Amino acid sequence: MVLLQLDPFLNELTSMFEKSKEKGSVWVTLKRSSLKSKVQKRKLSSVGESIEYRCLIRATDGKKTVSTSVGAKDHQRFQASYATILKAHMTALKKRERKDRKKSTEAEKKESTSTTKSKKL
C-alpha cells in the first residue's frame, strides 16, 4: 500500500475508475486515524495533549491499492475534488425511467375507448 499526497491520490483514483469502466470495480474506504502508534497515543493522553485525527482514505481495484491521509485543513478542498471525480465516473448509477402508474392506466383507458369507438363506426 502506497501513502500518497492528495493530488497524486486523486489522479490514481481517476485512472482506477477509467480502467474499471468496462469491467471491474473500485472500492474506496474512509477511516478516522491518528497515524500514531498506541504507545505514542498513550504518552500524549497522559501528558494531556489532544490527538489530531486525520481521515485515512484507501482505494483499491483488487490489484492495486493506494491511500492518502487528509487533515482538517485540507478536508474541504479534497471533498470537492473527490465529489467531482465520483460524479464523473458513476455513470452506472443513473436513475431509471419509470412509468407513472396513474398516467399509464389513464393512457390505456383512452386507447381502449378510442379503439372501441372506431370499431363501432
Swiss-Prot record:
This is Signal recognition particle 14 kDa protein. Keywords: Cytoplasm, Ribonucleoprotein, RNA-binding, Signal recognition particle. Residues 103-112 have a biased composition (Basic and acidic residues). GO terms for cellular component: cytosol; signal recognition particle, endoplasmic reticulum targeting. Component of the signal recognition particle (SRP) complex, a ribonucleoprotein complex that mediates the cotranslational targeting of secretory and membrane proteins to the endoplasmic reticulum (ER). SRP9 together with SRP14 and the Alu portion of the SRP RNA, constitutes the elongation arrest domain of SRP. The complex of SRP9 and SRP14 is required for SRP RNA binding. The gene is SRP14. It comes from Arabidopsis thaliana. GO terms for molecular function: 7S RNA binding; endoplasmic reticulum signal peptide binding. It is found in: Cytoplasm. Belongs to the SRP14 family. Heterodimer with SRP9; binds RNA as heterodimer. Component of a signal recognition particle (SRP) complex that consists of a 7SL RNA molecule of 300 nucleotides and six protein subunits: SRP72, SRP68, SRP54, SRP19, SRP14 and SRP9.
